[in-house]
Amino acid sequence: MEPWPLMAWGLMLTAITGWIKAVQSRDFTEKDIIFLHPSTTPYPGGFKCFTCEDAPDNYECNRWAPDLYCPRESRYCYTHHKMSWDGNTVSVTKRCVPLEDCLQTGCSDIDHEGNRVCTACCEGNICNLPLPRNETDAIFSTTSPINRSAQSTQTLPLLLLSVSITSLMLHSIN
């Protein structure tokens, strides 16, 4: 047999193996996130969250999540994970939310149906990739102080009070 047909077979097999898709994992990776990460936003501080309502599992939620920016009034990504008594996922809900919706994170006890619910919130672009499964995961994680505007408004009265007390003390000493 001449070498050319053998080489042609080798090239053809190489091309065919490139067409065959490998089995893909049912979880998203950080590499997938890089493709979803925006280069521009519709408004300053704009971000995206995975969003779904009562998806059967995390993969289906993340896979079919619409690629939309969160509304301006939202600041966090929320995840609600309902599990059966043995830890299998019953449903997943993810969405963009304001601060008020993130004040009750954590896990509930098993209810009368044998289900447990864990909720988590996070701040950042597409930060709600994983599911909360226990108290360690079901947290509220932020990248900035939650009450930034309230801190500055509380600091001024405290400063004025401190200055007033100090001046009264100094005045009474003299």
UniProtKB/Swiss-Prot annotation:
Disulfide bonds join 49-77, 52-61, 70-96, 102-121, 107-118, 122-127. Glycans are attached at residues 134, 147. Its main location: membrane. GO terms for cellular component: membrane raft; plasma membrane; side of membrane. InterPro entries: LYPD6-like (IPR039457), Snake_toxin-like_sf (IPR045860). It is found in: Cell membrane; Membrane raft. Residues 1-22 form the signal peptide. Keywords: Cell membrane, Disulfide bond, Glycoprotein, GPI-anchor, Lipoprotein, Membrane, Signal. GO terms for biological process: positive regulation of canonical Wnt signaling pathway; regulation of canonical Wnt signaling pathway; regulation of Wnt signaling pathway; Spemann organizer formation. A lipid is attached at residue 149 (GPI-anchor amidated serine). Residues 150-174 form a propeptide. It is a lipid-anchor; GPI-anchor. Residues 47-141 form the UPAR/Ly6 domain. GO terms for molecular function: acetylcholine receptor inhibitor activity. It comes from the Eukaryota. It holds the Pfam family UPAR_LY6_2. Interacts with fzd8 and lrp6. Acts as an important regulator of embryogenesis through its enhancement of Wnt/beta-catenin signaling. Positively regulates Wnt/beta-catenin signaling by ensuring phosphorylation of lrp6 specifically in plasma membrane rafts and its subsequent internalization into signaling-competent vesicles. Essential for the wnt8-mediated patterning of the mesoderm and neuroectoderm during gastrulation. This is Ly6/PLAUR domain-containing protein 6. The gene is lypd6.
